[in-house]
């Protein structure tokens, strides 16, 4: 059951919610836990349900921000250009970028790699290697393009979005990208904090 705008949460884990209740305390340190709430939907009787408490709104806000940019790039390019955001210079972010580049965006003509708002890590060489693939054979059985070798590298044009809040390795990666001549940098200068 979904909670919607207009529904009223009447209790959390058996504690009644009133106008004076500090409900934040009832959720403190419960991220990822199942909690029992009672919810009144409209004029009907309140119903109890278990939900999983979230950790913060950051993840949802970040996912929405990325999704909005993906949709904008897809719409403006007619689906010809892909968009990936590198959240951090770490292996989890790299796996997401790798998966999108060589999965969802494999048939795109180009990709925008957004490194803005990235706190750093140690990924510059991995990203540079991934984005600097040089295709040496195209697979097009009966005129249908299915891929290029190397299959595990991006072999098409790319550009990198940068910003003044790129920190540490996120400040170093644009230098590597530019020095190797992989593609264009777009945005505000990075602070040089690597």
Where on the chain are the PLM-derived regions?
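A short glycine-leucine-enriched loop at secondary-structure breakpoints
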Residues: 1-8, 26-30
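Cleft-lining beta-strand/loop regions that shape enzyme active-site pockets
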Residues: 15-194
């Amino acid at each position: 059951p979904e909670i919607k705008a207009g529904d009223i949460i009447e209790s959390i884990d058996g504690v009644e919610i009133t106008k004076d209740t500090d409900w934040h305390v009832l959720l403190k340190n419960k991220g990822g836990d199942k909690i029992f709430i009672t919810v009144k939907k409209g004029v009907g009787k309140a119903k109890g349900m278990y939900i999983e408490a979230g950790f913060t709104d950051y993840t949802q806000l970040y996912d929405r921000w990325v999704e909005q940019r993906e949709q904008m790039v897809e719409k403006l390019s007619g689906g010809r250009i892909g968009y990936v955001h590198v959240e951090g210079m770490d292996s989890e972010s790299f796996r997401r970028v790798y998966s999108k580049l060589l999965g969802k965006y494999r048939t795109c003509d180009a990709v925008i790699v957004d490194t803005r708002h990235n706190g750093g890590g140690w990924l510059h060489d991995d990203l540079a290697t991934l984005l600097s693939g040089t295709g040496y054979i195209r697979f097009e059985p009966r005129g249908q393009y299915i891929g290029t070798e190397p299959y595990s590298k991006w072999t098409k044009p790319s550009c990198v979005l940068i910003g003044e809040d790129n920190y540490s390795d996120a400040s170093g990666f644009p230098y590597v990208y530019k020095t190797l001549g992989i593609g264009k940098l777009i945005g505000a200068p990075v602070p040089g904090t690597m």
